[in-house]
């Protein structure tokens, strides 16, 4: 059975096209880790549950880099995501980095684009090492693929 690629809702399209801390989706940021995408935004995770970010395969211990400068609002364990770092960009954009084996930043810390913030692990819901990467705009998960090269 083949499933159709995920199509954003009208609300998601409006959010993606609005400007905020990360700007419009123009593939302007480097990937947080190099590696193939295991799961894309909107693909089926289990039953009717869909991924709200993307999962990128990378070896355990690979450096996870912030895609843009911002302030860390969470650095620690989050159920389902393992060790997670969430960076706030501007007023309403968040980048999320999960499934890590180690976190190198603290809540409240300012980070720069390209700064190592964590190490890839398998502390989330997968049995193999990978990075969960997501972007949220105004509290709504949006497809992060549009922002990264």
Where are these predicted regions, by residue range?
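Extracytoplasmic/periplasmic cell wall- or extracellular glycan-interacting regions that localize
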Residues: 1-81, 86-88, 96-98, 136-149
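Residue-level recognition of beta-strand microenvironments
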Residues: 40, 75-76, 103, 120-123
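Short beta-alpha junctions and helix-cap segments that line functional grooves
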Residues: 51-52, 99-100, 121, 130-131
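Ser/Thr-centric signal marking residues that sit
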Residues: 62, 95, 123, 127
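Short histidine-centered loop motifs in beta-beta connectors
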Residues: 75, 90-110, 114
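Conserved, short, structured surface segments that act as functional micro-motifs
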Residues: 107-149
């Amino acid at each position: 059975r083949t499933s159709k690629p995920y199509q954003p809702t009208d609300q998601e399209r409006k959010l993606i096209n609005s400007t905020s801390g990360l700007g419009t989706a123009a593939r302007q940021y480097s990937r947080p880790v190099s590696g193939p995408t295991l799961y894309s935004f909107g693909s089926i995770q289990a039953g009717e549950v869909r991924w709200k970010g993307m999962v990128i395969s990378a070896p355990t211990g690979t450096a996870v880099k912030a895609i843009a400068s911002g302030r860390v609002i969470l650095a620690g364990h989050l159920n389902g995501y393992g060790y997670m770092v969430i960076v706030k960009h501007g007023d309403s954009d968040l980048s999320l980095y999960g499934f890590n084996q180690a976190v190198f930043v603290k809540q409240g810390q300012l980070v720069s684009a390209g700064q190592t913030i964590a190490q890839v692990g398998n502390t989330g819901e997968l049995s193999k090492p990978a990075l969960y990467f997501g972007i949220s705009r105004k509290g709504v998960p949006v497809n992060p693929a549009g922002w990264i090269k």
